[in-house]
Amino acid sequence: MMKLANADGQVSGSYFYEKYKQDIPLRGQLNGQGYVLSSSIYGNDDKDVDHLELTRAEDGIKGAFTSGSGKQLPVDLHVIPSGAVPEPKPGLHFSRGLDDYEKLQLANLTFAPGKTETVGGKYVIQWYTESRSKVSMFRVVSGYPAPVIASINNVIDSDFYENLSGYFGCSDETGKPGTDTLQVSDRYLDDRFVSYAVSNSWFCAGAAHPDFALGGTTIDAKTGKRLTQEDVYWLGIGSKPAPNSDAWMKYRDAVFGPAVVKLLKRLYPKEMMPVGDDNGCNYADPDVWKFGSWRLAEKGMYVGAYFARAEKACDNPEWSFIPYGELKKNNPALFGG
């Protein structure tokens, strides 16, 4: 499978083998009806890179492929009409729409069942590993009513597929996986919530530097629906804004960030002390708390901090939990207070 984008004769894109699913970056030129492409990131003189010479025809694109080792193969590509590719798995919901290339990349994945474990003495989960990436995720087996389990697992599967899309779409300069880690780093299940964190680190071809992130998901164990942070801990007045809307951005900037700093100063005065130089982690800055990750855990709601590139080591401190006592005062209907 291949996708190409043309900007004034400069072509960029990627392709993958169905056997591996991993993106291999492409770059080159379009001259008239002909493409001259290479899997090199920075220049055509790199060793062990693939080369393609392709020509557009009525029924697709044809040409020749030469591997880095010199092996030559014919190429015969057929255009897939936009929107013709079905979803990789029915019923999943992604934070952004997948294009046809990504849908094909996620199609026909296989998952090997792994160990089962009991969480909290009651809730049974089973782990599954995707065969190509070796990335693992759990699904809920028992502990909640069957219809709720189905909804919970739909949210988990949606996250899993979206993370796999990111994995296959990130390659290093040789076309091998650019993702170093992608794993569940924490999970919490009780009679009211299913919550987990996913840690990710990567260095994709063409990027200026490696990066890492922590993502969180929390699900209502009564309904099986995904919860936003505003569903759990709302500090505003009136109706809650839609996530990522202008009103939500304003709320996060003017209300949420400052309120979290005020609360954390009371809960963790030592950790929130202002730093005396430019090299410290300034957790007293409301901006670093506005858009961080969050999840529920034994200690309460974890709120992550997000710093600029030069201070990334300060991201997501271990201590920044809002206890359930505070959450109950804010949202007694949800937390049984």
Regions found by a protein language model. Give the residues of each.
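Central antiparallel beta-sheet cores of small beta-barrel/beta-sandwich binding domains
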Residues: 1-58, 62-65
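Short helix-loop boundary/capping segments
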Residues: 216-279
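Short consensus segments that form the blades of beta-propeller domains
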Residues: 16, 205-210
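A short, surface-exposed beta-strand/turn
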Residues: 28-30, 212-227, 317-336
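Edge beta-strand at a domain terminus
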Residues: 18-34, 60-100, 211-218, 222
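A short, structured loop/turn motif at beta-sheet edges
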Residues: 29-34, 55-57, 185-193, 218-227
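Short, surface-exposed coil-to-beta transition loops
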Residues: 21-25, 47-50, 180-182, 210-215, ...
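Active-site acidic/histidine clusters and adjacent loop/turn architecture
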Residues: 82-195, 199-203, 291, 296-310, ...
